[in-house]
Amino acid sequence: MTFTWRRGAAYLLIRYERTVREALRNPIQVLSSLTEKSKNESYRFQRLYRNLYNPEFYWLAYKNIYANTGSMTAGADGTTIDGMSDERIQRIIESMRDKSYLPKPARREYIAKKNSNKKRPLVIQSGNDKLVQEVVKMILESIYEPVFKKTSHGFRPNKSCQTALYQIQKTFTGTNWFVEGYIHACLDSSNHHTII
């Protein structure tokens, strides 16, 4: 009787561990867990890098990128995210594991601005770099998005110039000073070494 109970308990433990591992592999659940933990100010994240070893993150990133109409533009190395496969993802993961992954140089194109004869720079990454960047973006957003101030509108999900203007319209109470200025090609002319 004891023998069968022990076998049953061992079986349940193995099944439980497998279920926990599978749940941890689900990127949506991992991201939700990171979001919940980020609400605790005293919590310190550790081993976030290991999420880059999870193939399911790359498939979710692929799904996010593929929905974008410009995602099939080839990078400087000629690759796109088209033709994604488990083998390609495993190669990326292995290069992450042995720390040999290096981003490829980006390709810079100049595209015309709407209703203007001026052009703006557009940086196009290689397919693998787009994928890795999307995975990192998902992880960082899940950690930092819950703790950002409601007044921050730049480069955030569901935030834009329009949401900033709407907030100003609803909450603006007046000011003593306005400063008007024009920053020409701000990001292009900034010293990136100083910023970083």
Spans of features found by a protein language model:
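Non-catalytic terminal/accessory segments
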Residues: M1-I196
